Regions:
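Non-transmembrane, interaction-prone alpha-helical and coil segments associated with secretion
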Residues: 1-177
Length: 177
């Protein structure tokens, strides 16, 4: 295998192996994070709805966890509250529905995302020449004590959740079809 292999194929093969290894590590880490829940609980988390005093529509545990995870920094909390038309009291009421295992899970998710900060910032800086500004964690009060908070990627729910503001979106997005 000559210079062409060394220049072309070796880097491709190494990148492919590195990608496969990173995917395996990520899968294992996520499996460990979610291992606090049974399969049945994970299924019910997405489908079983409950009411929260002061919140108009019933929600799922998955949505309640999303509220908690988005409360871990000021910018996500603001987006959550303005996008879903929730007050701080409603956010707190939703967080208060979660059990101790749920709040420990949320902190472990924030901690997991923190493990990528240096590498992702280094990559962004190498690609753009600008180092991203870190999102500052903000403490979150739960019934089981204060969580440190942390970064959680903002993702807009394309399935339109059942939180009150989404009821308006459903009407808006389906009225032109």
């Amino acid at each position: 295998m000559g210079p062409a292999y060394a220049a072309i194929m070796r880097p491709i093969n190494e990148a492919t192996w590195n990608r496969a290894e990173r995917l395996r590590q990520g899968r294992d880490a996520l499996k460990k994070l979610f291992s606090v829940y049974s399969r049945r609980e994970l299924v019910e988390m997405k489908s079983k709805r409950f009411t929260v005093p002061g919140v108009a529509a019933p929600i799922t545990k998955e949505q309640a966890l999303g509220v908690l995870l988005n409360s871990g920094n000021a910018s996500n909390l603001q987006r959550l509250m303005s996008g879903q038309k929730l007050t701080r009291d409603q956010v707190q009421a939703i967080i208060d529905t979660l059990d101790e295992r749920d709040v420990r899970f949320a902190q472990s998710v924030w901690d997991y995302f923190e493990t990528f900060r240096k590498e992702s910032f280094d990559l962004e800086e190498s690609l753009t020449g600008v180092r991203p500004e870190a999102v500052k964690a903000q403490p979150v009060q739960t019934r089981f004590g204060m969580l440190r908070g942390g970064y959680y990627p903002v993702a807009y729910d394309t399935d339109l959740s059942a939180l009150p503001a989404d009821q308006d979106k459903v009407g808006t997005q389906t009225s032109g079809r």
